[in-house]
């Protein structure tokens, strides 16, 4: 499968009429080094002077997951009782929360604000690509999961581990994109986990998707049926793995000051929305060193199903639904069972998370939806919550102020 680095060429062809203005961003406050692209998450955190721990947990169905912890800030030695768990989006990893540097990475910012920061990794990404009995390279059974299993099994397993280690009974949860989807799955099918959440913050929330505007995602959704059949026939189960080949392509196309770097930027824009003023081109080599982190084909197909159905429901197995669910169609997630306080942060220019879908989500969450906040930048896109130059100002400050209420 092609990564966003290769999709860049296609994205350029279909989106060349909307190219962003060329910017060198030499005065960008986000500081990065190209060597960061090759460092592991613990190596990155250590390099910038923060404490770090790496934990492994095993799920009930045998997946071995990695969690990274920043127990306190750079200038502190005290571990706080304020625990926060960060969950990444599709094709991502715990690296998302730190690769923009100490002044812009949410993981670092929260640690310096006095939080005990834990960053999860879902099954199938390169940090959680392990199992007690299955080999991801040879056993297709390893990849038979979507974001349903991530929300139903992975996230509660990681949260239980975090609470056990810290001795706390509840924590804050912050998710981006799929990290919000998996939270809604967890708290709707395991309502007992609502009591373990002080508050949840959805950055670019995704549940309902029938109004999303990403042209490439619409193309994928339209062809999802034939593509799914083809993937099964030729044995493709893993989507956009993180490996040496992908890293090499990223080095070639996305290097800082490289003439092809604009292809990478426009690939991201074509999927998530155009936001040239927020894109720090200097972090692209680091970003493409850590992303894509890998996922299952079924994770992507589950989102394609959401786009086509307009519903927020479990994975559609087609004719096998009757055996799986006892009905011809998958059951919807019962959002009315979610009681944890939820704050939704969304933006005009997010092609993946449409405003009308976020409003519908808030309505269906009922009293659990404490508030929804429109980002005060009309160009803010789906990835800017993580990598945008003004993400701390527009998003993180709001989240931290809201956390203080709970």
Give the role of each language-model region:
Residues 19, 164-169, 180-326:
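Alpha/beta-hydrolase-fold enzymes
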């Amino acid at each position: 499968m092609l990564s966003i680095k290769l999709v860049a060429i296609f994205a350029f062809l279909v989106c060349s009429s909307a190219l962003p203005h060329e910017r060198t961003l030499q005065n960008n406050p986000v500081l990065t080094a190209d060597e960061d692209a090759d460092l592991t998450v613990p190596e990155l955190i250590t390099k910038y002077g923060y404490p770090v721990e790496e934990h492994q947990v095993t799920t009930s169905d045998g997946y071995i997951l990695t969690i990274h912890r920043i127990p306190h800030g750079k200038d502190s030695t005290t571990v706080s009782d304020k625990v926060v768990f960060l969950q990444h989006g599709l094709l991502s990893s715990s690296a998302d929360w730190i690769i923009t540097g100490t002044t812009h990475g949410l993981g670092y910012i929260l640690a310096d604000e006095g939080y005990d920061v834990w960053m999860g990794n879902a099954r199938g990404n390169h940090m959680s690509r392990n199992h007690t009995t299955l080999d991801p390279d040879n056993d297709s059974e390893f990849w038979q999961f979507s974001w349903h299993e991530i929300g139903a099994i992975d996230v509660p397993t990681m949260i239980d581990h975090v609470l056990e280690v810290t001795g706390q009974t509840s924590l804050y949860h912050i998710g981006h994109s799929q990290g919000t989807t998996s939270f809604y799955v967890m708290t709707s099918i395991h309502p007992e986990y609502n009591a373990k959440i002080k508050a949840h913050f959805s950055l670019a929330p995704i549940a309902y998707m029938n109004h999303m505007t990403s042209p490439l995602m619409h193309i994928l959704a339209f062809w999802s049926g034939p593509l799914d059949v083809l993937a099964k026939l030729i044995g493709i189960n893993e989507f956009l793995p993180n490996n040496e080949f992908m890293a090499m392509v990223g080095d070639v196309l996305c290097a800082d000051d490289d003439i092809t770097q604009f292809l990478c930027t426009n690939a991201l824009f074509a999927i998530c929305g155009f936001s040239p003023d927020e894109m720090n081109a200097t972090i692209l080599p680091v970003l493409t060193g850590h992303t894509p982190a890998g996922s299952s084909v079924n994770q992507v197909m589950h989102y394609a199903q959401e786009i086509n159905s307009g519903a927020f429901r479990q994975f559609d197995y087609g004719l096998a639904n009757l055996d799986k669910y006892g009905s011809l169609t998958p059951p919807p997630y019962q959002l009315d069972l979610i009681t944890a306080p939820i704050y939704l942060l969304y933006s005009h220019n997010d092609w993946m998370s449409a405003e009308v879908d976020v409003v519908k989500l808030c309505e269906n969450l009922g009293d659990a939806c404490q508030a929804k906040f429109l980002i005060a930048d009309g160009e803010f896109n789906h990835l800017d919550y993580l990598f945008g130059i003004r993400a701390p100002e527009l998003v993180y400050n709001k989240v931290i102020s809201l956390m203080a209420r709970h």
